[in-house]
Design a protein with these regions (language model features):
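N-terminal Rossmann-like FAD-binding beta1-loop-alpha1 element of flavoenzymes
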Residues: 2-36
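Structural motif
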Residues: 8-9, 135, 258
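Predominantly flavin-linked oxidoreductase catalytic cores and closely associated redox partners
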Residues: 24, 109-233, 247-251
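N-terminal FAD cofactor-binding segment of flavoenzymes
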Residues: 24-28, 32-81, 97
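Short acidic-glycine loop/turn motifs at beta-strand connectors
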Residues: 78-83, 192-195
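Short beta-strand to alpha-helix junction loop
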Residues: 84-104, 139-140, 206-214
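FAD-binding beta-loop-beta segment adjacent to the flavin cofactor pocket
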Residues: 181-184, 239-261
Length: 263
């Protein structure tokens, strides 16, 4: 194993942003030696990402099209006093699909399974190796969030198998008919097949604390309200996402160093 790796582009962080950058470069600049550095076993982690058809320009659709696991031509929203079906396409990507696509496109030699210990003009890895690249992109996540005034979007989602089927024919992107706990709250449902549905309890709050067990119980209660009998929980993911409302943005960007940022 060489002590120094040389390449054209080094991407620190194999989440959604880092994975998409790697895929895009491999497609449009295949002559470049691109390395993706990620210490965890799976590119993209454990996530389901969703987007509306209108979120991505037609000319950029080629990048995400192979990653789409589920597509629906419309979706529902529900509030205490009204509900609607909106005629816009909706899509979901499972992180396992991103992982497989990145590994197939880059090949095993260009994915560096190591922890980044320092990033600057070059990347230092925790195992003692260094990466010297013409371009370095830091896609490992946020810098010093204390520079910003933040709220938080918090969620827990579970992929459920429902005995006898769930009866949904399209996503419920926002069901705000539920009890409002600790801030604005809604339930999100993605019907993957007749018996499988991803249910996520999402809410906005002033606190980053996530009460995992409470959210699990809320999903159970929501399933019971719909008359669903949960046969199995096939996956679970959680998230606490910062929502910037103000602060010192110049200090925030400086806190992350001078390397190009993504994600």
């Amino acid at each position: 194993m060489p002590d120094e790796i040389k390449c054209d582009v080094a991407i620190a962080g194999g989440g959604l942003a880092g994975g998409l950058i790697a895929l895009a470069l491999a497609e449009v600049r295949p002559e470049l030696d691109v390395r993706l550095i990620e210490s965890t076993p799976g590119i993209g982690g454990n996530h389901i990402w969703s987007f509306f058809d209108s979120d991505i320009e037609p000319g950029a659709r080629w990048l995400v099209e192979p990653l789409i696991c589920h597509h629906w031509s419309n979706y529902d929203v529900a509030f205490p006093s009204h509900r609607r079906t909106l005629q816009t396409g909706y899509n979901s990507i499972e992180s396992e699909r991103l992982d497989a696509a990145v590994r197939a496109k880059l090949g095993p030699d260009r994915i560096v399974a190591a922890q980044v210990s320092m990033i600057g003009s070059e990347i230092e890895l925790s195992d003692g190796r260094t990466i010297a690249a013409g371009t370095i992109i830091d896609a490992r996540g946020p810098a010093d969030l204390s520079c910003l005034d933040l709220g938080w979007q918090k969620f827990l989602g579970q992929k459920l198998r429902i005995r006898g089927g769930h009866g949904l024919v399209r996503p419920i992107v926002m069901d705000a008919t539920v009890l409002q706990n600790d801030g604005y709250r809604f339930i999100y449902c993605l019907p993957f097949d007749a018996e499988t549905v991803f249910v996520e309890d999402t809410y906005y709050s002033d606190s980053p604390t996530l009460e995992v067990e409470a959210l699990r119980q809320r999903i159970v209660a929501y399933a019971q309200l719909r008359g669903w009998q949960i046969e199995a929980v096939e996956r679970e993911e959680t998230g606490v996402l910062p929502v910037a409302m103000g602060g010192n943005f110049a200090s925030y960007w400086s806190s992350g160093g001078s390397v190009a940022k993504a994600g």
